[in-house]
């Protein structure tokens, strides 16, 4: 009986185990089916960044939008809400004639901001010369071998068809030269002009136009990011609006770039939270031009100094090789470091879980310079953390594979064998000379390694040329994100030639598209002086210093706009396209927009579209701009929210009540000062 009971028990356990396996398999099958059918619907409600390296970390997922603190940090800029974009022709505007004086073929050199600044100038020059414009050739793509043959030159970055349709009523435009002129260009038989930065209309009418009429074609080489002076005479004001139509409406990125930019924007707004776009402006060329090498250490200083020596040799820089970087920084001529920008943002009131998007291409010094910013803000991201490699590959197109990347490997160790004569004799050989020095292959690894071996910078490899073309697409994504950001701040707005840079174009586009969008234009000289006051204790700022920073940053929104009209516009019209490309509403004409020189009234149909928004602004002005839950004491300045649940939050509210009245008076005083200006 006992044996039969054991056998029965074993067989029963086997059946139970088998049943468990069947149920497990059935459960897995059901889960897979449910996942397959519900994948599309669930993706609409889930945070779209779960497959990326960035995991958003928030103190409180619920983000209150109707508080005074939100309006101060993220709300629209007051007093310029009546400023609206208007780049349409005013008065009589003639279409381009059927017969022109000839063809203008343009080759544009430089990076993203130089290309974008040059194209509107080229279109304006073509209309000025009554010429047919050939789609401009972008040197950064034509010289880069190995890029996708699907996109060439202008079409590698922008949408050709949209560009041609936008300017069809202004300039005749064709994709290529006629066959006979194309052959002459290949033989270098057409006249060519290397145009200087900011050339005057007089230059084109008296030097280029006669040659164009004689030869029916001219080639313009634009090497410096702009071929027409920024400020034109009053009788050529329509050419300024033509520039705006080209830059802000005609230059649309190609479909693949636009789609990825939209995806990045969607992934940047988890749970509908706002974000800051930050452009460090720290390029090697800009640092060398302005003499900021001593802000860095070791090899980075050598690289900057080498570039400055190269600029001096070619006449780009007129100063000395060795410059006191500390004096340059105090004079506001060097970029604000990411750590300093982080301190300013925290002092203004942005919390540790604020989303910050780092834009503007590569940051000189690498990710090491961004470590302090990551330490102050948890959600610091860029395009690499918001896109996948296959999405970037799709944007690049199908590219040829190159095997010219030769990895530096240690030299082979040759095993020396004794000669037969030494083996046969018993005589002790003479001491051998010391072996030759081991090649310092470890010193020349990396893109900077040539500094240790040579005074001459090596020529770019095929892969480096292709990467330069990719950088145009990377900055295109950054440009779209920066223009659409809730807040924008830059560490520097000058390039390696002293001209307005990527950040300047972004600020100009934001001013045109939405003048009330919050854009900080900090005075670097005043910021440097404030930072010097706490240089020895930067993370223990007191309430007085924080108040000074807030006043300075708040003034930079409007006063920086006024300063930009004097400083940046003289070099680049697109960095400040006001008042030529703006209008002011008829129902609410009184604002700081009139101080910017805007007197043209918008069409009547525009007033109805903005009336509701203006009511919201007025209601916001009636409330005190208090900093609720604002950690303004030095002890909590850079601290994350401590554990303690609601009790801690209540304590912060109680502690902040004493400061609310004082800060409310400060904000009211600033509003009065702003209205007086």
Swiss-Prot record:
<feature type="region of interest" description="Disordered">
    <location>
        <begin position="619"/>
        <end position="677"/>
    </location>
</feature>
<feature type="transmembrane region" description="Helical; Signal-anchor for type II membrane protein">
    <location>
        <begin position="15"/>
        <end position="35"/>
    </location>
</feature>
<keyword id="KW-0735">Signal-anchor</keyword>
<dbReference type="GO" id="GO:0000138">
    <property type="term" value="C:Golgi trans cisterna"/>
</dbReference>
<dbReference type="GO" id="GO:0016757">
    <property type="term" value="F:glycosyltransferase activity"/>
</dbReference>
<dbReference type="GO" id="GO:0005768">
    <property type="term" value="C:endosome"/>
</dbReference>
<keyword id="KW-1133">Transmembrane helix</keyword>
<dbReference type="GO" id="GO:0006004">
    <property type="term" value="P:fucose metabolic process"/>
</dbReference>
<keyword id="KW-0294">Fucose metabolism</keyword>
<dbReference type="Pfam" id="PF10250">
    <property type="entry name" value="O-FucT"/>
</dbReference>
<feature type="region of interest" description="Disordered">
    <location>
        <begin position="410"/>
        <end position="437"/>
    </location>
</feature>
<dbReference type="InterPro" id="IPR019378">
    <property type="entry name" value="GDP-Fuc_O-FucTrfase"/>
</dbReference>
<keyword id="KW-0808">Transferase</keyword>
<protein>
    <recommendedName>
        <fullName>O-fucosyltransferase 27</fullName>
        <ecNumber>2.4.1.-</ecNumber>
    </recommendedName>
</protein>
<keyword id="KW-0119">Carbohydrate metabolism</keyword>
<keyword id="KW-0812">Transmembrane</keyword>
<comment type="pathway">
    <text>Glycan metabolism.</text>
</comment>
<feature type="glycosylation site" description="N-linked (GlcNAc...) asparagine">
    <location>
        <position position="651"/>
    </location>
</feature>
<feature type="glycosylation site" description="N-linked (GlcNAc...) asparagine">
    <location>
        <position position="592"/>
    </location>
</feature>
<feature type="compositionally biased region" description="Acidic residues">
    <location>
        <begin position="665"/>
        <end position="677"/>
    </location>
</feature>
<feature type="glycosylation site" description="N-linked (GlcNAc...) asparagine">
    <location>
        <position position="130"/>
    </location>
</feature>
<feature type="glycosylation site" description="N-linked (GlcNAc...) asparagine">
    <location>
        <position position="542"/>
    </location>
</feature>
<dbReference type="GO" id="GO:0016020">
    <property type="term" value="C:membrane"/>
</dbReference>
<keyword id="KW-0472">Membrane</keyword>
<dbReference type="GO" id="GO:0005794">
    <property type="term" value="C:Golgi apparatus"/>
</dbReference>
<keyword id="KW-0325">Glycoprotein</keyword>
<dbReference type="GO" id="GO:0005802">
    <property type="term" value="C:trans-Golgi network"/>
</dbReference>
<feature type="compositionally biased region" description="Low complexity">
    <location>
        <begin position="644"/>
        <end position="658"/>
    </location>
</feature>
<feature type="compositionally biased region" description="Acidic residues">
    <location>
        <begin position="622"/>
        <end position="631"/>
    </location>
</feature>
<keyword id="KW-0328">Glycosyltransferase</keyword>
<comment type="similarity">
    <text>Belongs to the glycosyltransferase GT106 family.</text>
</comment>
